[in-house]
Every structure is written in structure tokens, then in C-alpha cells.
């Protein structure tokens, strides 16, 4: 573990004194949701981080910071649209690994559409991860 930490410290583009910062963004990608907003509510192990009612094209963005001396943040969100609900983890770190597949740009991007929830780390290649039930 010490060896891994020292090696990581020598990569300045990924480390600051405050830690490594990741962008988490959830976008309402509906094309025809009329007067029904997409409602999102998120929490972390530290408590409630809040929610929003998103109209078409609106987004909910926050940042997670990883550091060697603080607990690793994990977030869970509930999406509600009409009568459908989805719960998912937009940012989760498995012990000894990097967060999800957030990539070298450190972005966890989510696009919510009528048929489900899509993930990307570069805002161009989207992979469907969850379907509305």
C-alpha cells in the first residue's frame, strides 16, 4: 500500500494537496417530457446532498474528492419520472481501484433518456447501463 501511494504521488496531474477531484453530472436527455420533469435526489455516506427537478436539457452536477486520508465518497441517486423510479450509484469506488470508469479526465457523466440511463466518461461515447422498469 505504501508503494502504491508513493507511486501515485509522482503523478502530479492526478494529485493535489486536497486530493483527486471527479466531476459527476446527470443530464435530463428526454426529448419530449412535456410538463413532467425528471426528479433526482442524491445522498452520500455523509448525508443528503439534495435534489432537483430537471427539465429537458437541465443537469445536476457536483464534485467528489478522493484523498489518501479521508473516507472514500460514495453516492447514490434516485431518479423519478412519472411513475417510474430508478436507483443507481453515479460514483462509487471499490477498494483499491479507481472510481467506476471515470477515465483520465475524471468525469462520471450520466444521460437519462426515455429508454434508460447512459454512462460516459468523455461526453461522446454513451453506454446504456440501466433501463426504466
Predicted regions and their residues:
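Intrinsically disordered, low-complexity segments enriched in small/polar residues
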Residues: 1-73, 78-133
Amino acid at each position: 500500500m505504501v508503494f502504491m501511494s508513493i507511486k501515485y504521488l509522482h503523478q502530479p496531474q492526478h494529485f493535489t494537496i486536497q486530493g483527486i477531484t471527479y466531476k459527476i453530472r446527470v443530464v435530463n436527455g428526454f426529448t419530449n417530457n412535456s410538463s413532467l420533469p425528471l426528479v433526482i435526489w442524491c445522498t452520500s455516506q455523509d448525508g443528503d446532498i439534495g435534489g432537483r427537478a430537471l427539465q429537458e436539457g437541465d443537469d445536476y452536477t457536483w464534485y467528489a474528492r478522493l484523498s489518501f486520508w479521508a473516507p472514500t465518497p460514495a453516492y447514490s441517486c434516485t431518479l423519478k419520472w412519472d411513475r417510474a423510479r430508478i436507483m443507481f450509484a453515479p460514483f462509487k469506488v471499490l477498494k483499491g481501484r479507481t472510481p467506476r470508469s471515470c477515465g483520465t479526465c475524471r468525469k462520471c457523466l450520466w444521460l437519462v433518456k426515455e429508454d434508460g440511463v447512459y454512462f460516459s466518461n468523455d461526453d461522446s461515447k454513451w453506454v446504456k447501463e440501466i433501463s426504466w422498469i
